[in-house]
């Protein structure tokens, strides 16, 4: 079943403006042997800036194309072409006409007509089109067998011409993939990320858990320690995307870390916090009876036998074999917490995901009464 974008959007558009993203990749970054001319369609949201920064650090010549409305102060040293992804709005794509690049990285495509317009316009003047899709473009992506591969069929819509992204975000991405492939056969890289997390993720879906561990005390641990969870650090995703362009890899890739035990993830959150947080494991059916549901209040978790468990157990073997590198969960937790704690106090006080403190206390009390 398709999931509404309002319920689950895998890449956040919320982003705090900055002129650069120094130091987020750690250590010195080797320069690419052959610098490329790379055009970014978008590049100023959440994933885009991380990818732009890594491409710059690798020595590539980067151009940004967007409307010039979001985080316009970012990357002042780069060439910026102002336009609109929709060729029917304002100056449309006219700023791209007559130009050539080695590769395009499209982080802002949501409607097949619009993705097709850019891919067709650039088909004779770029060598490779890398499109950022989503893991939820697959048919019945929430359900089904665990560790499904890129061979799983795409989702379909009764009306593939719809442009209602808020309702059909997931399966519209599947049609965007098809549009890009039709314009540039055998020259498209389809990147299908799972939940994108890390520094500058303003959704708080990942961040809630380590920050809750920081608070200490008794903490709800939904389900069982053996349930599985899965995500991708935005920096690992960015590095793999640039790697695909540098190596001219044209394939479909699920880009997620290998599924890990849920208990291991929560233990890592507590260890990183060095707090007195203690886990109280509560079955999913009890939590549901008390208004706590997977991917609503309980982000990143689903019971192993829940209809949504397939969302957290995709295979990333193809991407790993192609060069995807996954940093330790402890590093993602540490850096995300450090970023979050650098935000203004009023923002930190308004966690955007997770269980409200009073609700957690209420459910814990009900659980202990039930156990008694």
Enumerate the predicted regions with their spans.
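N-terminal secretory signal peptides and thylakoid transit peptides that target proteins
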Residues: 1-19
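N-terminal Rossmann NAD(P)H-binding glycine-rich loop of SDR-like oxidoreductase domains
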Residues: 41-58
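Conserved Rossmann-fold cofactor-binding substructure of NAD(P)-dependent oxidoreductases
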Residues: 82-100
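NAD(P)-cofactor binding segment of oxidoreductase domains
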Residues: 99-155, 177
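Short-chain dehydrogenase/reductase
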Residues: 146-177, 230-231
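Conserved beta-loop-beta element that borders a ligand/cofactor-binding pocket
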Residues: 176-200
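Substrate-positioning beta->alpha
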Residues: 204-209, 222-245, 251, 331
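Mid/C-terminal beta-alpha module of Rossmann-like enzyme folds, strongest
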Residues: 243-317, 334-337, 344-371
């Amino acid at each position: 079943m398709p999931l509404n974008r309002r319920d689950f959007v895998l890449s956040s558009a919320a982003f705090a403006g900055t002129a650069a993203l120094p130091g987020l990749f750690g250590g010195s970054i080797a320069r690419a042997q052959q610098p490329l001319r790379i055009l970014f369609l978008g590049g100023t949201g959440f994933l885009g800036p991380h990818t732009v920064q890594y491409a710059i650090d690798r020595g590539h010549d980067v151009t940004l194309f967007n409307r010039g409305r979001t985080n316009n102060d970012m990357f002042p040293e780069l060439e910026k072409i102002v336009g609109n992804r929709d060729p029917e709005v304002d100056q449309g794509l006219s700023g791209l006409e007559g130009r050539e690049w080695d590769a395009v990285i499209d982080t802002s495509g949501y409607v097949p007509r619009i993705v097709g317009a850019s891919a067709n316009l650039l088909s004779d003047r770029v060598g490779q089109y890398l499109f950022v899709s989503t893991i939820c473009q697959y048919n019945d992506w929430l359900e089904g067998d665990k560790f499904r591969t890129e061979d799983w069929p795409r989702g379909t819509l009764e009306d593939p011409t719809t442009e209602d992204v808020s309702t059909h975000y997931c399966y519209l991405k599947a049609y965007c993939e098809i549009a890009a492939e039709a314009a540039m056969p055998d020259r498209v890289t389809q990147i299908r990320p799972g939940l994108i997390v890390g520094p500058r993720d303003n959704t708080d879906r990942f961040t809630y858990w380590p920050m809750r561990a920081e608070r200490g005390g008794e903490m709800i641990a939904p389900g069982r320690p053996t349930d599985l969870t899965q995500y991708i650090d935005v920096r690992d995703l960015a590095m793999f995307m640039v790697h695909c362009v540098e190596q001219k890899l044209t394939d479909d890739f699920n880009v997620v870390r290998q599924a890990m035990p849920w208990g291991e993830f929560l233990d890592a959150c507590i260890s990183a916090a060095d707090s007195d947080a203690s886990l109280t494991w509560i079955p999913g059916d009890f939590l549901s009876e008390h208004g706590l549901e997977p991917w609503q209040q309980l982000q990143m978790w689903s019971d192993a036998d829940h209809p949504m468990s397939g969302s957290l157990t995709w295979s990333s073997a193809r991407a790993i074999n192609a060069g995807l590198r996954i940093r330790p969960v402890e590093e993602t937790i540490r850096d995300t917490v450090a970023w979050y704690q650098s935000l203004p106090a009023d923002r930190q006080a308004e966690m955007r995901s997770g269980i409200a403190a009073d609700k957690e206390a209420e459910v814990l009390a009900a659980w202990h009464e039930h156990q008694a």
